Curated annotation (Swiss-Prot):
Species of origin: Debaryomyces hansenii (strain ATCC 36239 / CBS 767 / BCRC 21394 / JCM 1990 / NBRC 0083 / IGC 2968) (Yeast)
UniProt gene name: HOG1
Names of the cofactor(s): Mg(2+)
Main location: cytoplasm
SMART domains xrefs: S_TKc (SM00220)
Protein name: Mitogen-activated protein kinase HOG1
EC number: 2.7.11.24
Keyword DNA repair attached: no
Catalysed reactions, as listed in the record: L-seryl-[protein] + ATP = O-phospho-L-seryl-[protein] + ADP + H(+); L-threonyl-[protein] + ATP = O-phospho-L-threonyl-[protein] + ADP + H(+)
Domain Protein kinase: 23-305
UniProt keyword Phosphoprotein present: yes
Amino acid sequence: MVSDGEFTRTQIFGTVFEITNRYTDLNPVGMGAFGLVCSAIDKLTGQNVAVKKIMKPFSTSVLAKRTYRELKLLKHLRHENLITLDDIFLSPLEDIYFVTELQGTDLHRLLTSRPLEKQFIQYFTYQILRGLKYVHSAGVIHRDLKPSNILINENCDLKICDFGLARIQDPQMTGYVSTRYYRAPEIMLTWQKYDTEVDLWSVGCILSEMIEGKPLFPGKDHVHQFSIITELLGSPPPDVIETICSENTLRFVQSLPHRDPIPFSERFAQCSHVEPEAIDLLAKMLIFDPKKRISALDALSHPYMEPYHDPTDEPVCEVKFDWSFNDADLPVDTWRVMMYSEILDFHQIIGAGANGTTQEQMAQIQQEGIQAPSSQYQQTNQEQKVE
């Protein structure tokens, strides 16, 4: 461990963690595609926190944009069932660190450790839907809901995390993004048109996994994934097939043998440990046609949610998220300036003041003549794909 003024440098899993002296007792808790997460103690508050290092955020414009998007979303979305950003800073090595509250575990770990009792299944489903109602009201789609992105503490308080892949509500959404098991069929079928309903499909997959203790659609690849979906739901209806934009995908779907759907009451007949209302809600989430899929708002009013549903305590986001930056095709240096500006703004909002390193870096790049973009971003016909 090396101390350098306000920062302490240590190696964890071969990764350099360079954090402010405010945080001590680092211990690794998880590794993702875009960063390493450690638990730590916040000396200022005495609380346990999670510190997420974003790996090489300025190595490419795509990664810089992804990090900027996640930061903007974490600043904007403030809800009891969403992870809360408590601090953010840049290290002397120009790595970015997000500090959030520390949850004891995630749903994936919980599901692999023991079966869930029905009251926990119900309460966790309610909290996911409560958080999603807020997210969708802000004009945001999560796009990557899965058990490992559902954090839970010892009091069974649940928080949705990892908004790095979140996107604007847009009828021309593109690309594969979510983990395959939880991916809505319209993403696989069209690669083009989808909306908030993709998140409800993911919730249905998560609810089923909580009920049975194993993934509902464990596809080995995209073809197998779609095939096992049709084993339960039957062949997609004609109006869904008509929305398929790819000729290759259309030919593949049309080549499949016709399958009749299996009633959910029959498929989950052995799941006597949960209420029939849970299976009914599941059937309303896992529908081929996204237009017929239940919304988060309506799902909260479903009889299965009745023990927890309280319309006066299920808030929406008062201000839509500003996606004006999202189609911008900007160089890394510009994203860097924008990122520094957002970090300074965050510290001004929370009243803590930005750390000196950030202010010095901001002054330095301004001296180098790199200017932040105007409100009119350079537009591109299509956003670069983020994997």
